[in-house]
Amino acid sequence: MPVPRSAKISMSASPYKQLEQEFKRLHAFRGALALLRWDAAVMMPRGSADVRGEQLAALETEHHALLTAPRIIRLLDRAQANTQGLADWQIANLREMRRQRDHAIATPVTLVSRLTKAASRAEARWLEARAQGKFEAFVPYLEEVVHLVRDKAALLGQALNLAPYDALVDEFSPGLTTADIDAMFKALSRRLPALIREAIIAQEGRPFLPLNGKFPAGKQRALVVEVMKAVGFQFDRGRLDESEHPFTEGVPGDLRVTTRFDPDDVFTGLLGALHETGHAMYDLGLPQEWRDQPVGRDRGMALEESQSLLIEMMVCRSRPFVRYVQPLIARHFGTSGPEWEVENVYGHLTRVQRGLIRVDADELTYPLHIMLRYELEKQLLSGELAVRDLREAWNAGMEQRLGIRPSNDLEGCLQDIHWAGGSFGYFPSYALGAVIAAQLYESMRAELAGLDEQLARGEFSGLFGWLRTHVHGLGAKVPVQELLKSATGKPLSAASFVRYVEAKYLETTASSAAA
C-alpha cells in the first residue's frame, strides 16, 4: 500500500511537488465536470442542453489548457530527469501525469470544445429521439460527433504512434489494443454460439415460473438502498438517483449512482444499481492518499467494467446471493409462493435467451452484443459505414449474431448513449471486463474459503477485502496485464470466462451448485 505522502522526503520546491499541486487542481476540474454531466442526465431540463454544453465546454477547455501548458511539460521533463529519492508510487504518478499530458496535447483545444458541445447536443437529441422512437431525428447530431471523433482519433493515433481506433481504446483501456480485443473475441466466438444453444436446451428441461408481482418504485428504491448499504456503498459520500440509462459519475468522495426501475420486474432496478455499485466500490476503494493524483485513479474502463460485472453477474446472479436477497424482497413487497423459492429465482436470473437489449442480456449472449457494437463503431469511424445506414447495419448484425431482429429503434440503434457522448472505443471494455472479472473471480474463490456462506448472509467484506488488495488499492500504479498476473498468475485470457459459464450454465461440475 502507498506510503503517506506526508511521510516522504520533503521536496516543497521540487518539480515533482509542483506537479502534484497542478494535478490536484486538474482533479478538482474533473469533479466539477462529473457533477455537471450527472446533473444533465438526472436533473437538468431538456431545453437546457445548449446552456449545459457551453458550461461543459468552458470547463473542458480550461482543463485542457492547464494540462497542456508549457509549464507542465517543463516540470515533467525536469522531474523525470531526476527521480532519485522518489518512491515507487511517485514514479508511477509521474508516468500517469505524462500519459495524461500526451493524450491532451494531441488534441487541439478547439477540437475539445467542439466535441464537448456536439456531444452535449447529441445526448439531448438522443433522449428526444428515444421518446419519439425515431432514429432519423438523431442522425445529424450523431454525424457531427462521428466526424469530430474521427478527427480526434487521427490526431491521437499520430501522437501516440497507434492506429486511430487503438488510440481511442487506449483512452479507456490503457495498454490494451485491438489485437487483445480480437484475440478475446476469437476465443469467445469459438465456444459461445454452441454454448448458448446448449444452455437453452438444458434450461428447457427445467422450466421456471414467472416472477409475477407489482413493484412500486419507492419500495424498489428502499430495497436497493438496503442492499447497497450491505455491499458497502457509503451514502454519506454518494447518492442514488434514477436516469434513462444507469451510470456512475463523480469522483471518490462524491459518487453518483443511477438506475432505472421497472414496475413489473424488481431485478431491473436492483441489478442495474448493483452493477453501478460495483463501479462505485472500485472508486471508493482507490488509494485515498492518492485520490487527487493520476496514479490514484482507476486503471481504465476494462478494469472498471470487470468490477461492475463481477458484482452484477457473478455475485448477484448466484444461489448464495439469491438466498440473501429473497427474504428482503418478501419483506419489501410481500412476495410468496413457489415462484419466489430460491431455485426458481435463480433460474430466472440465469435464464439464457437471445434478447435485443444489451443491458438486459445474460452472460452468454452479452459478448455478442459487444461484438456488434465493436464492429459497427470501427466502421463508422473508418467511413465504411455512414450514420444514416446504421439502423440497417445494426439490425442485420443482430440477426446474424443472435438470430433476432429489432422491431423498432429503441430495441436497436437507439438503446445506448455511448456514441452520442463521443465514447467510441468504450464498448470493448465491457467484454474485456467480463473476461477479467471471471479471471479475478476464479482466483478469489480459490483463496477465500467460505465465500458462498458469507454472501448468503449478506456479508461482502471478504469479497471486497480481496478486491481492495488485488485491484482497488493499486489505483493506476501498474498496467492491467501486470495486475492480472499478480492477482491470478496469468495474463488476460478468455479461458477462465469459458470455464465459468460452462460450469454455471451447463452445471458441468459439482462446484457449480455454488454458482
Regions found by a protein language model. Give the residues of each.
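Acidic/polar loop patches that form or flank catalytic/metal-binding clefts of enzymes
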Residues: 236, 289-293, 317-327, 387-388
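C-terminal, non-catalytic "cap/extension" segments appended to globular domains
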Residues: 5, 9-15, 34-37, 41, ...
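Active-site recognition of the HExxH zinc-binding catalytic motif
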Residues: 19, 157, 261, 265-288, ...
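All-alpha helical catalytic cores of prenyl diphosphate-utilizing isoprenoid enzymes
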Residues: 185, 189-192, 217-221, 227-241, ...
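A well-structured
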Residues: 4-174, 477, 502-515
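Secondary-structure capping and boundary motifs in well-ordered enzyme cores
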Residues: 51, 111-114, 141-144, 184, ...
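Post-HExxH zinc-binding segment in Zn-dependent metallohydrolases
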Residues: 297-338
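Contiguous, non-catalytic segments that form substrate-binding/exosite surfaces or channel walls
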Residues: 115-266, 505
